């Protein structure tokens, strides 16, 4: 039996409703509750998670910097487990350059994300949006793309506009696994992977499967196609905890990804589980 490779979790959400407002959570009852550092630390220790990054949780726009302040506190309290943060941003706003300048003074901020999968398609097509994302060139800050399968073409357009920005595609492109979406998603992934400045995050895809009936063979084609498109050196792993609770939870997702990669070489497993992420963010 192979020894378990340590995991670096590139996609962790902390939910502190006593400190921040999360407008979208009122629509998702299963997630509309606190998820605090202590909850995660207990699971991480048991599951072999050796490090993690906090991913922004789409807080109210006025509280973006407040979320960063909270995460800085959590990093200090995590005993070295939490290594940095991907912060929220609004590239469609004229004050984005000011936010970027502020972010470069915060050693804990390693990148940005702007939620797109629940926004009008036109948002990422705006010239101001694209030019502001392009400002990340040379900064060392990454940009996470959270788009639906049908929006992969829009993601490709943005990536093309910003050839010197390192992009991260979240959640294998958010395929509708429960609905059986595959061919259109697969073509979009193949095309997007042709761009050298984007890598794919295999994170929490169990949340998009049938929560009551999914099995390994339901998510296997999506994981395998993602790796086939991007290669073993351009994929990273993330939990998407606690959103992965919609498909069974952190422990279930870790067990699933270990099972899906059981036939991989030790080197390829290490690349997915921690080495590629550590190289992207130099951590």
Locate each region found by the language model.
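Generic structural signal for well-ordered alpha-helices
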Residues: 37-44, 68-72, 96-101, 133, ...
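Active-site gating/metal-coordination segments in enzymes
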Residues: 65-151, 157-159, 201-205, 209-213
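Short, electropositive alpha-helical surface patch
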Residues: 62-81, 165-169, 219-228, 251-260
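Conserved, mostly hydrophobic/aromatic
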Residues: 11, 52, 71, 85, ...
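Divalent metal-dependent hydrolysis catalytic cores, especially in the metallo-beta-lactamase
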Residues: 26-33, 39-62, 80-90, 110-117, ...
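Catalytic pocket-lining loop regions of alpha/beta-barrel enzymes
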Residues: 123-236
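Mid-to-C-terminal alpha-helical segments outside catalytic/metal-binding sites
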Residues: 1-8, 31-51, 225, 229-236, ...
């Amino acid at each position: 039996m192979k020894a378990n490779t340590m995991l670096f979790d590139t996609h962790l959400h902390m939910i502190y409703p006593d400190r921040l407002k999360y407008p979208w959570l009122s629509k998702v009852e299963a997630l509309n509750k606190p998820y605090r550092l202590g909850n995660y630390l207990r699971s991480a220790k048991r599951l072999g998670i050796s490090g993690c990054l906090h991913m922004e949780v789409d807080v109210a726009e006025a509280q973006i910097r407040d979320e960063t302040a909270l995460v800085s506190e959590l990093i200090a309290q995590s005993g070295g487990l939490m290594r940095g943060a991907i912060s929220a941003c609004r590239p469609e706003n004229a004050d984005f350059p000011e936010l970027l300048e502020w972010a470069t003074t915060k050693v804990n901020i390693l990148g940005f994300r702007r939620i797109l999968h629940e926004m009008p398609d036109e948002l990422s097509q705006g010239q101001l949006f694209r030019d502001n994302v392009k400002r990340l060139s040379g900064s060392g800050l990454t940009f996470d793309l959270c788009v639906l399968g049908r929006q992969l073409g829009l993601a490709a357009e943005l990536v093309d506009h910003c050839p010197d920005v390192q992009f991260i595609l979240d959640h294998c492109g958010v395929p509708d696994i429960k609905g059986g979406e595959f061919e259109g998603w697969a073509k979009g992934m193949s095309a997007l992977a042709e761009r050298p400045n984007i890598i794919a995050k295999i994170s929490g895809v169990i949340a998009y499967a049938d929560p009551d009936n999914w099995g390994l063979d339901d998510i296997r084609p999506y994981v395998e196609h993602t790796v086939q498109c991007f290669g073993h050196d351009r994929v990273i792993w993330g939990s998407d905890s606690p959103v992965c609770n919609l498909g069974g939870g952190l422990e279930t997702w870790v067990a699933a990804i270990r099972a899906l990669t059981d036939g991989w070489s030790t080197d390829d497993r290490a690349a997915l589980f921690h080495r590629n992420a550590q190289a992207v963010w130099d951590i």
